[in-house]
């Protein structure tokens, strides 16, 4: 939601290591920074350097978490883990998915260099996120990718989002609401 407004720096770490590095980076900015946390990530066990908590994750630098050659999958937060799992299942069917953790979601911080390099390699893009389509980043991101990298695309940019319904409060409805395999 905040990524749709100019002037905000929006960071969305998908793991504890990135959270610490991005938090340290955010503390250096004078601009307003929103750090999006997802409650479903709190239980994850991630490695962080015990001897050095002063590292930085560069603002505006996406992370290619899985190399691939058939489709580029752009995601963030809990989507990273879900998309890595889906990529493993696709690999068993002979489809090679490149998964990119966007990390930074605002317009000025979007890493179009990394996205573009991947699009040129795969020719196909899928944006996966948990937000309802009407409030999602996927529409703006799909438009931008189609404008910037049209000559490299073999098909329109695909989007996987949550349905346009109010966010559920029960665990069972939440599981049905969140895009999954």
What are these regions (language model features)?
Residues 1-29, 167:
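Conserved thiamine diphosphate
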Residues 39-181:
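Thiamine diphosphate
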Residues 26-32, 141-145:
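Glycine- and acidic-residue-enriched helix-capping/beta->alpha junction motif
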């Amino acid at each position: 939601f905040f990524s749709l407004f100019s002037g905000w720096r929006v960071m969305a770490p998908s793991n504890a290591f990135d959270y610490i590095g991005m938090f340290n980076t955010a503390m250096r900015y004078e601009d307003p920074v929103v750090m999006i946390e997802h409650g479903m990530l709190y239980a994850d066990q991630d490695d962080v350097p015990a001897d050095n908590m002063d590292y930085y994750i560069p603002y505006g630098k996406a992370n290619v978490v899985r190399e691939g050659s058939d489709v580029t999958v752009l995601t963030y937060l809990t989507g990273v883990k879900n998309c890595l799992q889906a990529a493993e299942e696709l690999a068993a069917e002979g489809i090679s998915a490149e998964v990119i953790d966007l990390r930074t979601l605002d317009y000025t911080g979007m890493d179009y260099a990394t996205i573009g390099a991947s699009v040129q390699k795969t020719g196909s893009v899928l944006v996966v996120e948990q937000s309802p389509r009407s409030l999602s980043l996927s529409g703006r991101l799909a438009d931008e990718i189609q404008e910037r990298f049209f000559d490299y695309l073999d098909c329109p940019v695909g989007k996987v989002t949550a349905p346009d319904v109010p966010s559920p409060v029960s665990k069972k409805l939440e599981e049905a609401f969140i895009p999954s395999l």
